[in-house]
């Protein structure tokens, strides 16, 4: 009888250990750390002078494109389409990375040539009109002409911010100048499911009403970043509409929290850098949907 009891206890212990091992294995597989996605980079720099004359205005376009190139576990084609679409636009999403980069560069040069040709045509009309005006009238009117067309500049690149736990967060930075004194820089943030390239949205990770709940946290973060004590002081630094600021869907996720980027012109003047607001998961647990990716990441802390 004692032998039977010992064997029974032994079997129960083995069963319990097997059950625990199975549970641990399941948890590890469904929420593994590494995505096992490899990335490659395409770099293209092209300069085009009007009429092939190096003394004339030109366009200069640079692309640095980081994209998923290989994986034994996920659908790389879906990931590539997502990266191409979000970096260059929906028009290019069915093209492979090399085709998309070359197509984007060639389209930029073509657009520049068309703009230059349109300017040349309008300049002829304006010159004919100006022939009827005095020099003073020309100088004071909107018909004053530049001797030559403008030069255009554009740089576009993307960077991987987070690549773990079934998520890829990446940021696209685009800078352009079309003849003005100031270059315009924008940041576009994307979070995608690493298994299929499907976007992760705010509605996927937050409970309803999250936007108003996050408002105060965003304002508090801006006050701390810029050393201001009041919203009025933020406005003195170049911010506006801060009391109405809300989450803008332009976010990144990592293993610590959510990062919002507010581009110049959204709530701040163009002379300021684009504000970035980091909100730790630990401060927004009640706002996170149960079993969402953000909720799971929060409990890794």
Residue ranges and their predicted role:
Residues 18-21:
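C-terminal motif of bacterial Sec signal peptides marking the signal peptidase cleavage site
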């Amino acid at each position: 009888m004692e032998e039977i009891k010992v064997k029974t206890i032994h079997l129960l212990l083995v069963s319990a250990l097997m059950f625990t091992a199975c549970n641990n294995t399941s948890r590890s597989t469904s929420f593994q750390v590494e995505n096992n996605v490899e990335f490659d980079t395409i770099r293209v720099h092209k300069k085009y002078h009007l009429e092939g004359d190096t003394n004339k205005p030109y366009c200069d376009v640079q692309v640095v494109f980081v994209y998923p190139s290989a994986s034994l576990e996920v659908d790389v084609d879906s990931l590539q389409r997502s990266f191409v679409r979000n970096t260059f636009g929906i028009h290019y999403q069915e093209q492979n990375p090399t085709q998309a980069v070359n197509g984007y560069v060639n389209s930029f040069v073509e657009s520049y040539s068309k703009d230059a040709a349109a300017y040349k045509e309008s300049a002829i009309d304006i010159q004919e009109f100006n022939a009827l005006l005095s020099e003073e009238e020309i100088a004071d009117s909107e018909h004053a002409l530049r001797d030559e067309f403008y030069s255009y500049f554009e740089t576009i690149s993307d960077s991987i911010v987070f690549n773990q736990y079934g998520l890829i967060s990446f940021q696209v930075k685009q800078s352009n100048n079309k003849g003005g004194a100031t270059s315009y820089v924008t940041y576009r943030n994307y979070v995608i499911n690493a298994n299929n390239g499907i976007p992760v949205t705010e509605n996927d990770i937050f409970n309803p009403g999250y936007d108003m709940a996050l408002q105060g946290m965003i304002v508090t973060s801006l006050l701390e970043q810029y050393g201001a004590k009041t919203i009025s002081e933020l406005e003195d630094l170049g911010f506006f509409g801060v009391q109405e600021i809300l989450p803008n869907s332009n976010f990144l996720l990592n293993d610590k929290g959510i990062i919002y980027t507010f581009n110049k012109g959204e709530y701040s003047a163009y002379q300021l850098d684009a504000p970035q607001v980091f909100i730790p998961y630990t401060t927004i647990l009640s706002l996170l949907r149960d079993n969402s990716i953000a909720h799971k990441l929060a409990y890794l802390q």
